[in-house]
Amino acid sequence: MADALDPAQMRTYFVLTEAVSLLQYEVRQQLQAEGGLSYVQFEILAKLSEAGGRQLTMTDLADGVVYSRSGLTHQAGLLEREGLIVRHVSPDDQRATVVGITKAGRARVAKVLPGHVRVVRQLLFESLSAQDVRALGDMMSRARDHMRARPPRSAAPRKRSAGSAD
């Protein structure tokens, strides 16, 4: 059996996961109520908005969004049906699908962003000093970078369902 976490590690782990869970719950409620969006849909739209008019590949999105490839494809399909994004085969690589945000997608982000900022500010940042925010950001960046040092999930082989032919 692996060594147990020490009490400080265990406390930190549980405090972190509880804080993230509480924040995610409120963010999800706000995004759904104000924009009819799931968190993953908002994340896709926000990443495309931040791309400054540049289109991203589905692989780029999958590597930047913590979500399964199949789930991401499904969420992108829902956004496309709503006219919030467009997808097409890359002219540079026929194997790649590129994604861009539409005017309606930008409008949806603009609609939910003020409430999103309000929720995050109230729940996460109100109780922290500017120094705390910098320190937390530094610590979480190191932890995230350590976790992301492994190959991206998009590079992992796809799991085959039972009974599929090789």
Regions found by a protein language model. Name each.
Residues M1-L5, A130-D166:
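C-terminal regulatory/oligomerization modules of transcriptional regulators
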Residues G77-A135:
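Charged, amphipathic alpha-helical coiled-coil/dimerization segments
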Residues M1-G35, E82, A162-D166:
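N-terminal leader segment of winged-helix/HTH proteins
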Residues L23, V27, V65, R108-S127, ...:
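Alpha-helical linker/hinge and terminal dimerization helices associated
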Residues Y25-S70:
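N-terminal helix-turn-helix DNA-binding core of bacterial DNA-binding proteins
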Residues M58, A76-G77:
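Short, hydrophobic-biased segments on the C-terminal half of alpha helices
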